[in-house]
Swiss-Prot record:
SMART domains documented for this protein: DSRM, RIBOc
Function: Digests double-stranded RNA. Involved in the processing of primary rRNA transcript to yield the immediate precursors to the large and small rRNAs (23S and 16S). Processes some mRNAs, and tRNAs when they are encoded in the rRNA operon. Processes pre-crRNA and tracrRNA of type II CRISPR loci if present in the organism.
NCBIfam families: RNaseIII
Native species: Streptococcus pyogenes serotype M2 (strain MGAS10270)
Residues that bind Mg(2+): 47, 120, 123
Family of this protein: Belongs to the ribonuclease III family.
GO MF annotation list: double-stranded RNA binding; metal ion binding; ribonuclease III activity; rRNA binding
Name of this protein: Ribonuclease 3
Keywords noted in UniProt: Cytoplasm, Endonuclease, Hydrolase, Magnesium, Metal-binding, mRNA processing, Nuclease, RNA-binding, rRNA processing, rRNA-binding, tRNA processing
């Protein structure tokens, strides 16, 4: 953890008072499960808190920054900023992926590169920072890490995968696209949805996410990847 402390101090001017919070934020459930006898805490509860404060701060920013945008436009832009893929990218940008504690199985299966894990890690860090330093510290961190990318318009230029898939398929003729929830697992604060895309009665692809919307986006992303290979 010493190297992580140095990274946060030198790169972001953040010094945690409660290092237990920081360590918990960087501990995945797979690691905690493999060390149950040591009563190791994992980051899911901090992730829940971080998700909430991230939504609030980004909503505040968009409301102030874009006085002429509609509620729908702001919601769509916010969803692109806080989606799993974006948060995983910010984790990598901050080099957080090098410090997360994973179980042996998760490590071997490539968990350190997985967007789901890295996106959750970013949210968990925000939750820990909120508890340790307060919401203004979270705002400063996001202003340093996330807001510059929003200012550049990077997220406004990105179409959501569902829209891209719909345009791709409709260009080839009349199609009926249906998103169906296959399963819903996990506790209320850490749901995992699986969704399938059914096109003209046939399953095209499946996707996973922490909400139905995220699972639908993942399924659409997978469908576009499959179609590009055809």
């Amino acid at each position: 953890m010493k190297q992580l402390e140095e990274l946060l101090s030198t790169s972001f001017d953040i010094q945690f008072n409660d290092l237990t919070l920081l360590e918990t934020a960087f501990t995945h459930t797979s690691y905690a499960n493999e060390h149950r006898l040591l009563n190791v805490s994992h980051n899911e509860r901090l992730e829940f808190l971080g998700d909430a404060v991230l939504q609030l701060i980004i909503s505040e920013y968009l409301f102030a920054k874009y006085p002429k945008k509609t509620e729908g436009d702001m919601s769509k832009l916010r969803s692109m900023i806080v989606r799993e893929e974006s948060l995983a990218g910010f984790s990598r940008f901050c080099s957080f992926d090098a410090y997360i504690k994973l179980g042996k199985g998760e490590e071997k299966s490539g968990g350190r590169r997985r967007d789901t894990i890295l996106g959750d890690l970013f949210e968990a860090f925000l939750g820990a920072l909120l508890l340790d330093k307060g919401i203004d510290a979270v705002r400063r961190f996001l202003k340093q890490v996330m807001i510059p990318q929003v200012e550049k318009g990077n997220f406004e230029r990105v179409k959501d995968y569902k829209t891209c898939l719909q345009e791709f398929l409709q260009a080839k003729g009349d199609v009926v696209i249906d998103y169906q929830v296959i399963s819903e697992k996990g506790p209320a604060h850490a749901k995992q949805f699986e969704v399938s895309i059914v096109v003209n009665g046939a399953v095209l692809s499946k996707g996973l996410g922490k909400s139905k919307k995220l699972a639908e986006q993942d399924a659409a992303k997978n469908a576009l990847a499959q179609l590009s290979e055809v």
